Amino acid sequence: MTVGRPEGAPGGAEGSRQIFPPESFADTEAGEELSGDGLVLPRASKLDEFLSPEEEIDSTSDSTGSIYQNLQELKQKGRWCLLESLFQSDPESDENLSEDEEDLESFFQDKDRGMVQVQCPQALRCGSTRRCSSLNNLPSNIPRPQTQPPSGSRPPSQHRSVSSWASSITVPRPFRMTLREARKKAEWLGSPASFEQERQRAQRQGEEEAECHRQFRAQPVPAHVYLPLYQEIMERSEARRQAGIQKRKELLLSSLKPFSFLEKEEQLKEAARQRDLAATAEAKISKQKATRRIPKSILEPALGDKLQEAELFRKIRIQMRALDMLQMASSPIASSSNRANPQPRTATRTQQEKLGFLHTNFRFQPRVNPVVPDYEGLYKAFQRRAAKRRETQEATRNKPFLLRTANLRHPQRPCDAATTGRRQDSPQPPATPLPRSRSLSGLASLSANTLPVHITDATRKRESAVRSALEKKNKADESIQWLEIHKKKSQAMSKSVTLRAKAMDPHKSLEEVFKAKLKENRNNDRKRAKEYKKELEEMKQRIQTRPYLFEQVAKDLAKKEAEQWYLDTLKQAGLEEDFVRNKGQGTRAVQEKETKIKDFPRFQETTKLSIRDPEQGLEGSLEQPASPRKVLEELSHQSPENLVSLA
């Protein structure tokens, strides 16, 4: 951190001093602000924040005496902090203390330091204050009283309290890097190496300009470009061959002499062909069907928006109807405002128009019996009534006869005698009597004159098989009849369902919308292709009209040279660019006022024309203001004598 002086003051570089800059933050926190008189106002560093008091110092109101007094107090505080933090327990503290005291005394008692020239910046003149926490704005040539050295003895309790925070303090050290950077900058500006670099840069720029001004000429077109390609040669040879074939064919046909009946047959064939063509044309004309035109609502591009709008209206109507229903349900007495609209809804009217052929009021009204019948009792009663009504067929009565075979005596066999003897000897219980056959019991009940009837098992099985076959056949017939009835009912139901669905469904089939959508997609593809071609043509036109790169470079260089010549002319005349610009604007304003005064009678006519043709008036208003570049070019063409006269 340095305190700058004016350039003309003697010893300006030597009189500057550094005030405790940190060692590690020399390069990063060296930002300085230069005022108009050469005063350097450094930024506040960590040491300044540590040493500065907790009050704002106003540079316009504080006097030099109060500043020096504050400096002495800060010096005393810094000494105490350094002594307490560094040398409270070190045996070599006496030597370090003496060295630090010498450095501080040499800094604060330096007689060669000049007075700091502090001037109020423009910001302070306007009423704004600036906080300054650095030490380089303080005067150093004011006589300072001799300070009393601090006493070396302190109570042990104070040493212990200080040692708790003294280890975390960073001790700053002075440095002279800012002076070194300023000296290096001055040496670099005045060194011959910089002049050599400038000379090389100017030489390189001249070579580039000469290279840009060089003229180019196109080389002649090579001879092989005009020679035909192999493909073109082959195409020409093929065309010559076909021409020769056609010519020879025509020659042969011209030499041929046809008979008279061949010409007659060809004429007949041609007449028949013409008749067929006329007949087919008439058939095509008669067979043309009257095609239905596509409605405009489908071809309209805003169909989707209309559908969305209709859906939104439908939702609003539903919400309003729900609110009306809620009010009608909540109020016990229906008022006149809550009565239903006598005019039916659109959906109801559409349903009545489409489904008017269906019967809604049927004459047959079935009665519902709430009592569940006793099906088992009813079935038994039905069985009894059926048994009574059944017709009984009288059985065939045979005349009774008596067979005498039972009275015959059979001779006993020896095996039968043995078995009977064993049965008598064995003490077994008497065997159970065998059941008598039905035929025998029937015969016993009959009289002696009746003939017994015997039904065999085969007859019984045959009857049961016939009965089961008849039952199966009846069941099959019933199932077939039920299927036919069910099929008819389902067909009728499906027809009614499809009719109702078509009447209630607002969407159209794919066949109706397919052609319109196909046409719309084709139109969109055609439109995109046209836009793409138009963009390509615009790109080609921009590329063709754009100047070459060397032309752009030459134009920019010429513009820079004109601007530089204009600035040099102003410097030679002793004028500034801002002054000339202000003068030019002032003269132009005067000229505009004069032209307005002259053209005032024509104002009404111009306003009428602008109202009639607003586009032309807009174009004229856009063309009137001149660009600043044109103004600069006009001023650059003026001579230096005119510029001097303006001054």
Swiss-Prot record:
How is expression of this protein distributed across tissues? Ubiquitously expressed.
UniProt feature, compositional bias: Polar residues: 332-350, 637-647
State the InterPro entries in the record: FAM161, FAM161A/B
**GO terms for biological process?**
cilium organization
Q: Where is the composition biased (Basic and acidic residues)?
A: 590-602
Question: Which Pfam families does the entry mention?
Answer: FAM161A_B
Is this entry keyworded Protein transport? no
Please provide, in alphabetical order, the Gene Ontology terms of the cellular component aspect for this entry: cytoplasmic microtubule; microtubule cytoskeleton
Q: Carries keyword Coiled coil?
A: yes
- Keyword field: Coiled coil
Bias kind Acidic residues: ranges: 91-105
Coiled-coil regions, chain positions: 262-292, 510-546
In residue numbers, the region (Disordered) covers 1-39, 89-110, 135-167, 332-352, 388-439, 583-647
Subunit-level organization:
Interacts with FAM161A.
Of which family is this protein a member?
Belongs to the FAM161 family.
The name this protein carries in UniProt is: Protein FAM161B
Organism annotation: Homo sapiens (Human)
